[in-house]
Curated annotation (Swiss-Prot):
Belongs to the GroES chaperonin family. SMART domains: Cpn10. The lineage of its organism: Bacteria, Pseudomonadati, Thermodesulfobacteriota, Desulfuromonadia, Geobacterales. Gene3D superfamilies: GroES chaperonin. Its main location: cytoplasm. The gene is groES. This is Co-chaperonin GroES. HAMAP family: CH10 (MF_00580). GO terms for biological process: chaperone cofactor-dependent protein refolding. PANTHER family: 10 KDA HEAT SHOCK PROTEIN, CO-CHAPERONIN GROES. It comes from the Bacteria. GO terms for molecular function: ATP binding; metal ion binding; protein folding chaperone; protein-folding chaperone binding; unfolded protein binding. The keyword Transferase does not apply. Transmembrane segments: none annotated.
Length: 95
């Protein structure tokens, strides 16, 4: 896969949540919500200011991130599902 996000956009692969609760109950696919955690797969060069300077993205490939429930746009590349979103949509980095 060769996709390079533009400006401050980030390509994220969702990290699937556990399908079993702590009590041992399995959650069916129909009851699961989309995960709000993911791993960064690709990062754009950064956002350009009005005077032409580039503000680099503060994230890197491999970072595990938390994002909003409705953040980003779902896309499919070579059969795999990804999200493409702006750096502002990222709520935090999971360390």
């Amino acid at each position: 896969m060769n996709l390079r996000p533009l400006q401050d956009r980030i390509l994220v692969k969702r990290i699937e949540e556990e399908t079993k609760t702590a009590g041992g109950i399995f959650i069916p696919d129909t009851a699961k919500e989309k995960p709000q955690r993911g791993e960064i797969v690709a990062v754009g060069n950064g956002k350009k200011t009005e005077d032409g300077k580039v503000i680099p993205v503060d994230l890197k490939v491999g970072d595990k991130v938390l994002f909003g429930k409705y953040a980003g746009t779902d896309i499919k590349i070579e059969g795999q599902e990804f999200l493409i979103m702006r750096e502002d949509d990222i709520l935090g980095v999971i360390e």
